[in-house]
């Protein structure tokens, strides 16, 4: 159960970083 949570959390972090990169490139 912990491994699944860790994997989901890692995926969430990656998506969040991608969102920041896309947002920054869109703003600038």
UniProtKB/Swiss-Prot annotation:
Q: What GO terms fall under cellular component here?
A: membrane
Query: What triggers production of this protein?
Result: Expression is regulated by the mother cell-specific transcription factors sigma K and GerE.
According to its UniProt record, where is this protein mainly located? membrane
Which keywords describe this protein according to UniProt?
Membrane, Sporulation, Transmembrane, Transmembrane helix
Q: Where are the transmembrane segments?
A: 4-24
**What protein family does this chain belong to?**
Belongs to the SscA family.
- Annotated protein name in UniProt: Probable small spore coat assembly protein B
**Which species?**
Bacillus subtilis (strain 168)
The encoding gene is sscB
